[in-house]
Amino acid sequence: MFPMVTEFMNYGQQTVRAARYIGQGFMITLSHANRLPVTIQYPYEKLITSERFRGRIHFEFDKCIACEVCVRVCPIDLPVVDWKLETDIRKKRLLNYSIDFGICIFCGNCVEYCPTNCLSMTEEYELSTYDRHELNYNQIALGRLPMSIIDNYTIRTILNLPEIKT
C-alpha cells in the first residue's frame, strides 16, 4: 500500500513541477507581447541606416592621386588601380580604378587610410545581382551617388532607435 501512496505523491509533485515550467514559459511569452515587431515589410519599408554604416564605396576620380594606399591596407588586396607615370610632370595619372564587391568584406580600411578622402562609404546596401560579374564596379559605377531612401516617396522609412520606457 505504501508504494502506491508514494507513486501518487511523486505524480502530484511532477504535475506541480510541469505546471510551474509551463507557467514560466507563458510569462516569458507575455513579456514579449508588448514589444514592437522587429520585422518590416522590406520592399515597401526600409530602415534608416546609422551614420557609420558601411555600405557601397563611393569613389571620386578627380581626388585620387594613385598612391595605392587603399590596396596596401586592404586585407585581401582588392582595389585594382591602373596608373601611368607622366614623366614631364613627374606624377602618376590614374587610368582605371575598380572594386569587386563580390569579394569585398566592407572593412572600411581603404576609406579610413585614403590620404585624399576620395573614398567614402555610402548607405547603399542593395548590391544583389543575378551575375557575379556585375559586382565588379569601375570608376564610373563607383562614382555614382546612391539614391537616398529618404527622398523616395514610395518607400516608408522607419527610424531604428531603441524605445525609451518612462
UniProtKB/Swiss-Prot annotation:
SUPFAM superfamilies: 4Fe-4S ferredoxins (SSF54862). Residues 55-84, 95-124 form the 4Fe-4S ferredoxin-type domain. It is an enzyme of class 7 (translocase). Binds 2 [4Fe-4S] clusters per subunit. GO terms for cellular component: chloroplast thylakoid membrane. It is found in: Plastid, Chloroplast thylakoid membrane. [4Fe-4S] cluster 1 binds at C64, C67, C70, C114. One of its GO terms (molecular function) is NADH dehydrogenase (ubiquinone) activity. It is a peripheral membrane protein. Keywords: 4Fe-4S, Chloroplast, Iron, Iron-sulfur, Membrane, Metal-binding, NAD, NADP, Plastid, Plastoquinone, Quinone, Repeat, Thylakoid, Translocase. Its main location: plastid. [4Fe-4S] cluster 2 binds at C74, C104, C107, C110. NDH is composed of at least 16 different subunits, 5 of which are encoded in the nucleus. Belongs to the complex I 23 kDa subunit family. NDH shuttles electrons from NAD(P)H:plastoquinone, via FMN and iron-sulfur (Fe-S) centers, to quinones in the photosynthetic chain and possibly in a chloroplast respiratory chain. The immediate electron acceptor for the enzyme in this species is believed to be plastoquinone. Couples the redox reaction to proton translocation, and thus conserves the redox energy in a proton gradient. This is NAD(P)H-quinone oxidoreductase subunit I, chloroplastic.
